[in-house]
Amino acid sequence: MLKKFKDLTLEDMKARRLALRKEYMDLRFKAVVGHVENPLKKRELRRDIARLNTIIHEYAIGIRKV
């Protein structure tokens, strides 16, 4: 999963992060309202969002070069 994120461009990472956030929010609402088929999916999504945030922040502070 991490290797896949490293291959994306900065704009693609930001778009992917937004999509993952929407998916995470939908999953949270489903968990509150009813049954979730895969409860571990929330953890995976949270961690993927954190990974993308880290990579995007590294570009912002100059650790990674575009």
Curated annotation (Swiss-Prot):
Q: Which UniProt keywords apply?
A: Ribonucleoprotein, Ribosomal protein
Q: Which CDD domains does the UniProt entry name for this protein?
A: Ribosomal_L29_HIP
In its UniProt record, a GO molecular function of this protein is:
structural constituent of ribosome
Q: Name one GO biological process term.
A: translation
Q: Which InterPro entries match?
A: Ribosomal_uL29 (IPR001854), Ribosomal_uL29_sf (IPR036049)
Q: Tell me where on the tree of life, at the top rank, the source sits.
A: Bacteria
Which Gene Ontology cellular component terms are annotated? ribonucleoprotein complex; ribosome
Q: Which NCBIfam families match?
A: L29
Q: Which family does it belong to?
A: Belongs to the universal ribosomal protein uL29 family.
HAMAP family for the chain: Ribosomal_uL29
Provide the protein name: Large ribosomal subunit protein uL29
Encoding gene (name): rpmC
